[in-house]
Swiss-Prot record:
It comes from Saccharomyces cerevisiae (strain ATCC 204508 / S288c). Alpha-D-galactose binds at R53, E59, H60, D62, N213, D217, Y274. It catalyses: alpha-D-galactose + ATP = alpha-D-galactose 1-phosphate + ADP + H(+). GO terms for biological process: carbohydrate phosphorylation; galactose catabolic process via UDP-galactose, Leloir pathway; galactose metabolic process; positive regulation of transcription by galactose; positive regulation of transcription from RNA polymerase II promoter by galactose. This is Galactokinase. GO terms for molecular function: ATP binding; galactokinase activity.
């Protein structure tokens, strides 16, 4: 296994004397530096950059603490920064996109945090999220400097090409770039930020604008590497391990990312979609535990998962029946063995109610009253349902988690006599994932299904939804390079989906809706 991004792995830093710059810096730094000079009539000191991400495989399993396989993409957020030496420091923000107005705010002289008002929807709030977590980190890192004194004033020019609202984590990319920039600006050239620290501090950043997330977005943005996918683990701690894609003879490994342009309003649909799935997988874990006579350890307090989850069940089952007291540590081979066993148990104990469990059925399985089940499982977040589909949801979580491990194993141990062998085998896992998301987890939609069908008919080997589903983005494994299928897939999607469903779509909107990426470098710095 390649080395995970632990404390000693530093965020890459480059400067103008570097012989060769990474692809995104070489392409984008000259332009943002010119724009900064035009805006501020001065040169920036450095540029901080962090990319968006796409999840290749591992959907709706992170909140059960199972590992996922995202990669950083060629679309990113950049912040060009000049550090100011002011008695009354302030931060000025200019965005290359004119729809995001210029902002300026003072930094508290006593070293207190800049306030964030989550009730106001403004792009500067996301900057302030990155500022806040960086400030908190600096206070712990050098309390003598930052406990009761202000941060350095900054002039910042922001530019990004991660399509917003597309499920490619533009907000995480922006916040990671901001946090990196603020730490660099205040600690100076002698301090080098570790990837682990940047990932750790940014995971909680969006909580300040009322968004809860599990850490995959930040891990992928910070730790991405060219030609690698990231095996992101959530237990026992957040960790990202890069795995290199195989070197193919005649093709590049590329991904077409196509946005359905269907927006699922998370707040409105949560009672029948996201919130309900969390309740169903939590209930499934507890019904399995009751069936096999084991007790789940309490999970995260303050959420429906304080009842434990499907990974917790796997661990306590193996402790009881296989005398393995150590919880699964993310190892690929033992994970494959355990998840395969979990799928057997799901068939044994939940398949008799494929049509769904009523509240009375669940209460009987848990040996509690209707009222107790309702109180303990159904009151944390609003949900609406006729029956709880415990069999389908548990089967998806365990089979999807197994596919993640099989994908990593395929990348690291398999040998391919022809390029097509890799595309077929990896693509098959992606197609199985989509089928599971559609049939078992029911988080697809007609537009996702249509896009996947068109792509597979025109040269994609694996096509699936990515992100929460019910709309949003799709990802497609497509051979790249001179002999590849990229243009054929893009053209088919444009003609058979976008121009049919959205006849008034503009060229610019179409360009934003279908993007192509290879696995890209994560967060980095460029010093002038």
């Amino acid at each position: 296994m390649t080395k995970s991004h632990s404390e000693e792995v530093i965020v890459p830093e480059f400067n103008s004397s570097a012989k060769e710059l990474p692809r995104p810096l070489a392409e984008k730094c000259p332009s943002i530096i010119k724009k900064f000079i035009s805006a501020y009539d001065a040169k920036p000191d450095f540029v901080a950059r962090s990319p968006g991400r796409v999840n290749l495989i591992g959907e709706h399993i992170d909140y059960c603490d199972f590992s996922v396989l995202p990669l950083a993409i060629d679309f990113d957020m950049l912040c060009a920064v000049k550090v100011l030496n002011e008695k009354n420091p302030s931060i000025t923000l200019i965005n290359a996109d004119p729809k995001f107005a210029q902002r300026k705010f003072d930094l508290p002289l006593d070293g207190s945090y800049v306030t964030i008002d989550p009730s106001v929807s403004d792009w500067s709030n996301y900057f302030k999220c990155g500022l806040h977590v960086a400030h908190s980190f600096l206070k712990k890192l050098a309390p003598e400097r930052f406990a009761s004194a202000p941060l350095a004033g900054l002039q910042v020019f922001c530019e990004g090409d991660v399509p917003t609202g597309s499920g490619l984590s533009s907000s995480a990319a922006f916040i990671c770039a901001v946090a990196l920039a603020v730490v660099k600006a205040n600690m100076g050239p002698g301090y080098h930020m570790s990837k682990q620290n940047l990932m750790r501090i940014t995971v909680v950043a969006e909580h300040y604008v009322g968004v809860n997330n599990g850490g995959m977005d930040q891990a992928a943005s910070v730790c991405g590497e060219e030609d690698h996918a990231l095996y992101v683990e959530f237990k026992p701690q957040l960790k990202a391990t890069p795995f290199k894609f195989p070197q193919l003879k005649n093709h590049e490994i590329s991904f077409v990312i196509a946005n359905t342009l269907v927006v699922s309003n998370k707040f409105e649909t949560a009672p029948t979609n996201y919130n309900l799935r969390v309740v169903e997988v939590t209930t499934a874990a507890n019904v399995l535990a009751a069936t096999y006579g084991v007790v789940l350890l309490s999970g995260k307090e303050g959420s429906s998962t304080n009842k434990g989850n499907l990974r917790d069940f796997m661990n306590v089952y193996y402790a009881r029946y296989h005398n393995i007291s150590t919880p699964w540590n993310g190892d690929i081979e033992s994970g494959i063995e355990r998840l395969t066993k979990m799928l057997v148990l799901v068939e044994e104990s939940l398949a008799n109610k494929k049509q769904g469990f009523s509240v009375d059925d669940v209460a009987q399985s848990l040996n509690c009253s209707r009222e107790e089940f309702t109180r303990d499982y159904l009151t944390t977040s609003p949900v609406r349902f006729q029956v709880l589909k415990l069999y389908q949801r548990a089967k998806h979580v365990y089979s999807e988690s197994l596919r993640v491990l099989k994908a990593v194993k395929l990348m690291t141990t398999a040998s391919f006599t022809a390029d097509e062998d890799f595309f077929k085998q990896f693509g098959a896992l992606m197609n199985e994932s989509q089928a599971s998301c559609d049939k078992l987890y029911e988080c697809s939609c007609p537009e996702i299904d249509k896009i996947c069908s068109i792509a597979l008919s025109n040269g994609s080997y694996g096509s699936r939804l990515t992100g929460a589903g019910w709309g949003g983005c799709t990802v497609h494994l497509v051979p790249g390079g001179p002999n590849g299928n990229i243009e054929k897939v893009k053209e088919a999607l444009a003609n058979e989906f976008y121009k049919v469903k959205y006849p008034k779509i503009t060229d610019a909107e179409l360009e934003n809706a279908i993007i192509v990426s290879k696995p890209a470098l994560g967060s980095c710095l460029y010093e002038l």
